[in-house]
Curated annotation (Swiss-Prot):
Keyword Cell membrane among record annotations: yes
InterPro entries tied to this protein: LIMR (IPR008075), LMBR1-like_membr_prot (IPR006876)
Main location: membrane
Protein name as annotated: Protein LMBR1L
Residue spans, topological domain Extracellular: 1-21, 82-112, 175-194, 316-342, 408-429
Ranges annotated as spanning the membrane: 22-42, 61-81, 113-133, 154-174, 195-215, 295-315, 343-363, 387-407, 430-450
Keywords attached to this entry: Cell membrane, Endocytosis, Endoplasmic reticulum, Membrane, Receptor, Transmembrane, Transmembrane helix, Wnt signaling pathway
Topological domains, Cytoplasmic: 43-60, 134-153, 216-294, 364-386, 451-483
Family stated for the protein in its record: Belongs to the LIMR family.
Provenance organism: Xenopus laevis (African clawed frog)
Length: 483
């Protein structure tokens, strides 16, 4: 009887493992397909349609690696929201037959896979893809893809030895454990997590710089996508003037007599493109319904303001909790705690707000990253992004997204504890570092918003009432906006 029970238990464990493998494979296949579609929208087709078959093959292999990395990035973004939603589902319907596949073992497996694939992409795939696209083969060797593979492998091996040597020296300096200094064989259990801990710390610091700036930029980006209300504006007259100006500049560019005149054709082309863009915006506003013109934009601004205010408020409350209770410190857990208790005081509603805030912070960090002067050159262009820039974008997004769970837990956006190796980072136990990080985020976010709304709100009100057409007002607003 005991033998039969033991066999049934082992069969159940095996079936659960197979089910988890199938679910993880389906999820990753979906993310890989979506990532491939996104990258093909931005890649430069000339890199893949070249006459040189060897270069085209190299670019295809690099494209597959970039697609894998981008899929891991999307998975890292979805990791914490999926875990929070799964916990609430298990709390609501714990014994439902159709959600038996959703359990703590699956969630832990997803966290471990994201951690593993993030290490694989950052340490091996992306460096290999970049070196592979730049390789030409050793001097005197036979030309071909394999020659590039050999050169890339040798260079990557030397680079890996250099990086792990630096990691070993850093761990010997900052770690008091003497066994850690003496052992180089414990690569998987110690040095890879230590290296990823440093990368995660860099990603969290990058989020600290990009997210507050992105929170203020979100208002401008949303305003460019929506139709803004204009209370005292004659739209038809404005459209007519823009059309006349566009026709006049087009005539100057296309006329045969322009070659005899001292005209800056490049400046005229730029001016024409700006006027055409402005005309398209005006036509979109004319086609918009009154509800869309006068209601959608204010509601969107209020929603962004509410999300930003809630985020800053949660961070301020988290600072107070850090000073009072040690339980507010981010930590990792190894046991399965899913479906036991809600990680929000407000239950399912609070969990939904947490998920929305996590996605909002990630979107703000991406907007802030591509809007910053340091990284604006990485901004991809549709159908015109070279492979090296695609690799840089994939690495940047992976660093930001893999740091998102730690970032959200550090700021107190959620109380969902970090699972797997994400909770093993040594710097998460440093109280002063966590406290300073929260205070800096709250201060930077508040400073960016105050600076944004000081002149932006005034300028929007003046434009809404049509006062920007006054010459003095235009000069004053523009000079203040540039300052």
């Amino acid at each position: 009887m005991e033998v039969n029970q033991d066999v049934s238990v082992r069969e159940q464990i095996f079936h659960d493992w197979v089910r988890e493998c199938i679910i993880c494979s389906l999820l990753f296949s979906t993310l890989y397909l979506l990532s491939y579609i996104v990258i093909t929208k931005f890649k430069k087709h000339a890199d893949f349609a070249t006459v040189d078959v060897e270069d085209a093959a190299v670019n295809r292999i690099a494209l597959w690696m970039c697609t894998f990395t981008l899929a891991v990035s999307v998975g890292a973004v979805l990791l914490l929201p999926f875990s929070i939603i799964s916990n609430e589902v298990l709390l609501s319907v714990p014994h439902n037959y159709y959600i038996q596949w959703l359990n703590g073992s699956l969630i832990h497996g997803l966290w471990n896979l994201v951690f593993l694939f993030s290490n694989l992409s950052l340490v091996f795939l992306m460096p290999f893809a970049y070196l592979f696209t730049e390789a030409e083969g050793f001097a005197g060797s036979k030309k071909g893809v394999m020659s590039r593979v050999y050169e890339t492998t040798v260079v990557l091996l030397l680079l890996t030895l250099l990086v792990f040597g630096i990691v070993w020296v850093a761990s010997a300096i900052f770690d008091d454990d003497s066994a850690g200094r003496e052992s180089l064989y414990d690569l998987w259990e110690y040095y890879l997590p230590y290296l990823y801990s440093g990368i995660s710390l860099f990603g969290v610091l990058l989020l600290l710089l990009c997210t507050p700036f992105g929170l203020s930029r979100m208002f401008s980006v949303t305003g460019n996508l929506l139709v803004k209300p204009r209370l005292l504006e004659n739209l038809e007259e404005h459209l007519s003037c823009t059309a006349f100006e566009e026709a006049a500049i087009s005539r100057k560019i296309s006329t045969k007599a322009s070659c005899w005149l001292n005209l800056n054709m490049e400046a005229l082309q730029k001016r024409l493109l700006a006027i055409q863009s402005h005309r398209i915006t005006l036509e979109m506003r004319r086609r918009a319904s009154p509800w869309q013109r006068n209601l959608v934009y204010p509601l969107a601004m209020l929603l962004l303001l509410a999300l930003t205010g809630i985020t800053v408020l949660i961070v301020c409350v988290n600072v107070l909790e850090l000073l009072i209770d040690e339980a507010a410190m981010p930590k990792g857990i190894q046991g399965s705690q899913l479906g036991k208790v809600s990680f929000s005081v407000f239950g399912s509603f609070g969990a939904a707000v947490q998920v929305i805030l996590i996605f909002y912070l990630m979107a703000s960090s991406v907007v802030g990253f591509y809007s910053s002067p340091l990284f604006i050159q990485l901004l991809p262009q549709k159908q015109n992004t070279p492979m090296t820039k695609i690799i840089g974008n994939c690495v940047s997004l992976l660093i930001l997204s893999s740091a998102l769970p730690v970032f959200s837990r550090t700021l107190g956006i959620t109380r969902f504890d970090l699972l797997g190796d994400f909770g093993r980072f040594n710097w998460l136990g440093n109280f002063y570092l966590i406290l300073l990080y929260n205070m800096m985020f709250a201060g930077l976010a508040t400073l960016c918003l105050v600076k944004k709304f000081t002149w932006a709100v005034q300028a929007e009100l003046i434009r809404a009432f049509g006062l920007d057409r006054l010459p003095l007002s235009v000069k004053k607003i523009r000079s203040q906006g540039k300052a």
